[in-house]
């Protein structure tokens, strides 16, 4: 069947019938939206009726030793206009190791005047999560993401009561229907196109979150400028941005979204604006 004869929503429905994985379909969905915007000779954000992003992105630091933090933070921010740092916690060595690392991040980030946020990647149990949220609330942390493991969503209710920081979910929210189950137990959701199956479902996730009065975030996995540019193209109304993985790729096989005054900005061109720099690398 000619792709022109089918809408993106029809192709999405077919992919679900065929049980195509979210990550695989995300690549196709992004390509379809890019094609549709190019056909209209419009930037993708404009085709979708969205503004260009204005919210500054965070850069991310993984679980590491305090000594590594001392080197890593300046490496990230000495020549960057980013103003937020996301710290991965949930160390297998326990919350004492998390505290030691966070304290070093707090110290090392002072010269850059950064906003700090924490992603526990589901690495805490309910008791430790409650303790860490209280501890972090006294140490300049803006919010905590995915404090509990995927599958432990019912325990979010206990954690949400009397929380001292906003709670976001990431792995616990893949599709828009997930939000309905625990919208009363979280403050926000983190959308990732590779996790949700691309732009089509991603827009549903954002709309559903906003309908329930939740804050929105968009993040990424280890992705190139292709999918980051697509994510940046839909981030104009999103509250928190975490689109930084392409800055770490050496080399990035594509070119597109760049940091402009701390904002991960899509290249303004028809489509999502990204292109392969050398197809032989793929």
Locate predicted features:
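Generic secondary-structure signature for well-ordered alpha-helical cores
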Residues: 2, 78, 107-110, 211-214, ...
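Flexible C-terminal active-site loop/helix
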Residues: 221-282
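N-terminal amphipathic alpha-helix/helix-capping segment at the start of soluble metabolic enzymes
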Residues: 37-38, 42-54, 262-264
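Metal- or metallocofactor-binding catalytic centers and their adjacent structured scaffolds
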Residues: 1-40
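Catalytic alpha/beta core domains of metabolic enzymes, predominantly
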Residues: 151-244
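Conserved, mostly hydrophobic/aromatic
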Residues: 28, 41, 85, 119, ...
